[in-house]
Structures are given as structure tokens and as C-alpha cells.
């Protein structure tokens, strides 16, 4: 496996065709100014979804590496994040409709490979389900899961509720955080079990004690996290689940090689390498 990923990573970097600019651009989508970056070139397009409240700035340290890949990469800030204008509706469905219009406008409609970090994992699953003919594979980087809160409550309701109250206070009604709480309450998203139907790579952080109080960072919390991630691809014969206790939740920053190798792994699944 290590040899295969190293070979694929070398192939991606070999003779790169660099196109586009690393400077953010702006498109008006449904009356909202949306910032995005479009770099690299190729027949395949990576589309990156960020975590809660995160915009383009989160990915800036990785742009030089991404621009060397033999693949086009599009990163954008959802409404209300980065320098994109705020919107009243930040639901998964509406956010994905805006993304679809952005991608169509810049002629990046086909052969898509979606990367979702944290909360962005919910977005890419829903997008792939809504546009299955366009999406070839998913890379989920320590992704949020709609059942995480309920499973933590099954383990220790008092601890889980105390921590949720603390987190709600820290997030101060951030719209996407509030949306995630609603998803936790519903315990479902409209993804049509897509992660069991197309090539998928999941990277899970099992690093303990990133915080010294949150139940999600406890031994049992991390086990629940791993198990939920595995459940997404339990019936997927063309999938990879990478688990590491050496990398925290911010996988792209904590372990750049793992991030780039996971991209290679996804492309390898699709290409049959």
C-alpha cells in the first residue's frame, strides 16, 4: 500500500501543468458574492469543502502543493465564510446548489472528485448524492457524522450534554454550527448512502486528548468516531479507511503527506491502480 501511494503521488507531481491563479476570484451566485480559487489543469477536478466557518485562508498553506498536481483544483468559501457574502440559507441543499452554479459557470461540471474536511464531509456526501453523474469519488478528511452527537449521548448523556452546552457558548450561534446541531437532531442527511456506491477514501484521526475536556476527544469518543466513519463504507468494496493516532483533526495541516497521499489513493481507486 505504501509503495502504491508513493508511486501515485510521484505520478501526480510528474510534469505538472500549472494553470489558473492562486489569487481568489469572485463570482456572484444567486445575488451572493462567492470567493473561489481555481488552480492546476487536467481532465479531473478536485473540489474542496472546508470545515465550519472556514474559507479559502485555511487552504492557503497548501496551494503550492495542490498547484503541482496533474489535476485541476477548485476551492471556495461557502456563503458567510472567508470573504463570501453571508446568506440566510446555509443548508446543505442550498449551499450545494450555489456550488453547482459556481462549478457550471467556470466549466468544471464533470469528472469531479470531492474533498470534504470536517463539516465539509456532510456537504460533499450530499452533493454527490444530488449530482451522482458528475462525481467520481469522495475523500472525507476526519468528516463530521450525523449520528455522532446521539452516539456520544448513548455513551454518557450527562458528559455529552455538558460539553454541547459549552461548545454552543463558544460558537455563539455561528450559522453553520447551528446547522450541524440541527443535523445532529435529525440524525440523517439526504445522501442516499452515496459513500457505499462510489470510490471513497476516509481519513480518521484517532489522536487522543486534543482537548482535555471534550467527550469527543476521549478514548470512547474516538472509538465512536472511528466506527461511524467505517459505517459509511461498510458495504463499499472500492474504498479505503486510513486511521491514524499521529494526526489531529486538522489533517491537511497536521500531516501534509497524508493529505496528498489520500488524494492519490482516491484517484488510484477510480483508475484501478
Predicted regions and their residues:
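N-terminal cap/lid segment of alpha/beta-hydrolase-fold proteins
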Residues: 20-33
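Conserved HGGG/HGGXW glycine-rich cap/lid loop of the alpha/beta-hydrolase fold
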Residues: 32-83
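Conserved hydrolase catalytic core segment
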Residues: 109-147
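Flexible "cap/lid" loop of the alpha/beta hydrolase fold
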Residues: 139-177
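Conserved serine/cysteine hydrolase catalytic core
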Residues: 162-245
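Catalytic active-site module of serine/aspartate enzymes centered on a nucleophile-bearing elbow/loop
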Residues: 239-273
Amino acid at each position: 500500500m505504501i509503495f502504491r501511494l508513493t508511486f501515485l503521488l510521484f505520478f501526480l507531481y510528474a510534469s505538472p501543468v500549472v494553470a489558473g491563479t492562486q489569487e481568489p476570484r469572485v463570482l456572484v451566485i444567486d445575488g451572493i458574492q462567492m470567493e473561489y480559487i481555481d488552480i492546476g489543469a487536467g481532465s479531473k477536478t478536485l473540489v474542496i469543502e472546508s470545515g465550519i466557518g472556514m474559507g479559502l485562508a485555511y487552504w492557503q498553506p497548501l496551494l503550492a502543493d495542490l498547484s503541482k498536481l496533474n489535476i485541476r483544483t477548485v476551492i471556495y468559501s461557502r456563503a458567510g465564510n472567508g470573504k463570501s457574502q453571508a446568506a440566510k440559507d446555509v443548508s446543505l441543499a442550498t449551499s450545494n446548489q450555489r456550488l453547482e452554479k459556481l462549478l457550471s459557470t467556470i466549466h468544471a461540471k464533470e469528472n469531479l472528485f470531492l474533498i470534504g474536511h470536517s463539516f465539509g464531509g456532510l456537504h460533499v456526501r450530499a452533493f454527490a448524492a444530488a449530482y451522482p453523474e458528475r462525481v467520481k469519488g469522495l475523500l472525507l478528511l476526519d468528516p463530521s457524522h450525523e449520528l455522532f452527537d446521539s452516539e456520544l449521548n448513548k455513551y454518557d448523556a450527562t458528559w455529552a450534554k455538558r460539553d454541547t452546552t459549552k461548545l454552543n457558548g463558544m460558537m455563539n450561534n455561528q450559522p453553520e454550527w447551528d446547522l450541524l446541531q440541527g443535523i445532529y437532531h435529525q440524525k440523517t442527511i439526504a445522501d442516499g448512502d452515496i459513500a457505499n456506491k462510489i470510490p471513497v477514501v476516509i481519513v480518521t484521526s484517532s489522536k487522543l486528548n486534543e482537548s482535555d475536556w471534550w467527550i469527543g476527544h476521549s478514548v470512547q469518543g474516538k472509538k465512536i468516531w472511528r466506527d461511524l466513519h467505517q459505517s459509511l463504507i461498510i458495504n463499499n468494496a472500492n474504498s479505503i479507511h486510513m486511521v491514524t493516532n499521529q494526526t489531529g483533526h486538522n489533517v491537511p495541516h497536521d500531516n501534509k503527506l497524508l493529505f496528498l497521499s489520500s488524494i492519490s489513493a482516491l484517484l488510484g481507486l477510480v483508475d484501478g491502480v
